[in-house]
């Protein structure tokens, strides 16, 4: 009956939040602000897409590198009204505050490496680039279609040239194509491959994920503690100061490898 239909629970708001690099959760709430959100689902690494619709048309929102750059979130609100909305957050209001303070009050430049006590660790002038995609539908898409859209956002098609072409036009100057025609060249190429494989694995092993960490790598490995010197003066993140970007982009142009392109 209509009375029974009207009595069905109406979920007006949903929250998709990547809490850590290894866990996301979905929460929902009725249209009453005095009520709480309850946990509706959970998982490991979300593809970062949320879809809302009426009986015919709909809208989806997807964020690139969603789980890698946690605590990303997508909110859906007003689902029981004629004015539903999707809101994307790089840092949602209910996430832990972004603490930009330094880990100490001194630079330790006399004990370890570098450090600038005159400036200190300041967040002034920093920036973070993020990509988002909006999709509009005239018909209700299937789950498979939505999954493919999410995968396309996370791994978009990119038009690239061959290593031979980059070398011919001298993109980024003078450099060589891979060659193993002598023992020394063979050793050098293998060492370059090992170096990339090591850093690629370290991203996952050390969990270099999160809004401010993903896309960066550390320098100076501490062989005694078996970790990077993240807590010793001016060591830790390379940013662009030690130009890992130059190394990675040259490695991509020499090889054409997708995994190197993604990391670069």
Predicted feature residues:
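Beta-strand/loop-rich accessory regions of lumenal/periplasmic or secreted enzymes
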Residues: 1-161, 214-223, 235-239
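Well-ordered alpha-helical scaffold segments within catalytic/enzyme domains
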Residues: 133-138, 174, 243-258
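Structural helix-adjacent loops and short alpha-helical linkers that scaffold large soluble proteins
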Residues: 140-142, 181-184, 252-264
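Low-complexity, Ser/Thr/Pro/Gly-enriched N-terminal "stalk/linker" regions
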Residues: 153-231
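Soluble or luminal CAZymes and related metallo-dependent hydrolases
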Residues: 187, 240-243
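The substrate-binding groove and active-site-proximal loops of carbohydrate-active enzymes
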Residues: 229-239, 250-255
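Inter-repeat boundary and helix-capping residues of tandem alpha-helical solenoids
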Residues: 238-241, 261
